[in-house]
């Protein structure tokens, strides 16, 4: 049985990337530079806009992060796709937290809006995920809406984020 907590540290998230947090066959987060959060500060089975689950995670921004030196030279900004990927990462993490098994794969998103940006001068990015539905069929799939907040201001929103857990992800090829 997986110990469910409301808070997960950076060390816990790194353990997840090695497959050590959610047990054998549990979903994994990406490792190192592609891990887009430093901690999960809240995770609940109820709550959020739809009372079907909620997560909040944070990333401390440092001016020397890898993407600032290459996106773009002379005009550094965090790629928006990394914020979107962070939201997918969190949906997959939640599926492991509720006991799901398999390899996580992003399956789509309804609509994404970028209304701000993350610059090297930013201090903290907060991600909020509001679960709409969890489907238990041949695969376990989470559906959620998300927000990316930079220093207290909502800068990205996404609707209908979808992540599934697959026993054999090669079926997607």
UniProtKB/Swiss-Prot annotation:
Gene3D superfamilies attached to this UniProt entry: Hotdog Thioesterase
Subcellular location: Cytoplasm
Pathway per the UniProt entry: Lipid metabolism; fatty acid biosynthesis
Superkingdom per UniProt: Bacteria
Pfam families referenced in this protein's UniProt entry, alphabetically: FabA
An annotated GO BP: unsaturated fatty acid biosynthetic process
Annotated PANTHER family: 3-HYDROXYACYL-[ACYL-CARRIER-PROTEIN] DEHYDRATASE, 3-HYDROXYDECANOYL-[ACYL-CARRIER-PROTEIN] DEHYDRATASE
Catalytic activity line of the entry: a (3R)-hydroxyacyl-[ACP] = a (2E)-enoyl-[ACP] + H2O; (3R)-hydroxydecanoyl-[ACP] = (2E)-decenoyl-[ACP] + H2O; (2E)-decenoyl-[ACP] = (3Z)-decenoyl-[ACP]
CDD domains noted in UniProt: FabA
The protein's role, per its UniProt record: Necessary for the introduction of cis unsaturation into fatty acids. Catalyzes the dehydration of (3R)-3-hydroxydecanoyl-ACP to E-(2)-decenoyl-ACP and then its isomerization to Z-(3)-decenoyl-ACP. Can catalyze the dehydratase reaction for beta-hydroxyacyl-ACPs with saturated chain lengths up to 16:0, being most active on intermediate chain length.
Protein family membership: Belongs to the thioester dehydratase family. FabA subfamily.
Keywords associated with the record: Cytoplasm, Fatty acid biosynthesis, Fatty acid metabolism, Isomerase, Lipid biosynthesis, Lipid metabolism, Lyase
Gene Ontology CC annotations of this record: cytoplasm
UniProt key word Lipid metabolism: yes
GO molecular function list: (3R)-hydroxyacyl-[acyl-carrier-protein] dehydratase activity; trans-2-decenoyl-acyl-carrier-protein isomerase activity
Assigned EC number: 4.2.1.59, 5.3.3.14
Protein name: 3-hydroxydecanoyl-[acyl-carrier-protein] dehydratase
Assembly and binders: Homodimer.
């Amino acid at each position: 049985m997986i110990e469910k907590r409301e808070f997960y540290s950076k060390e816990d998230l790194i353990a997840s990337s090695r497959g050590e947090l959610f047990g054998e066959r549990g979903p994994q987060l990406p490792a190192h530079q592609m891990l887009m959060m430093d901690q999960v500060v809240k995770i609940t089975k109820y709550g959020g806009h739809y009372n079907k689950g909620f997560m909040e995670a944070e990333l401390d921004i440092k001016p020397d992060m890898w993407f600032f030196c290459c996106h773009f030279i002379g005009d550094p900004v965090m790629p928006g796709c990394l914020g979107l990927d962070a939201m997918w990462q969190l949906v997959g993490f939640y599926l492991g937290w509720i006991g799901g098994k398999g390899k996580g794969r992003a399956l789509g998103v309804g609509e994404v809006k970028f209304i701000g940006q993350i610059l090297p001068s930013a201090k903290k990015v907060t991600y909020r995920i509001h679960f709409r539905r969890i489907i238990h069929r041949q695969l376990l799939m989470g559906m959620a809406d998300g927000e990316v907040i930079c220093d207290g201001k909502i800068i990205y929103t996404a609707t209908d984020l979808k992540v599934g857990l697959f026993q054999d992800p090669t079926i997607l090829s």
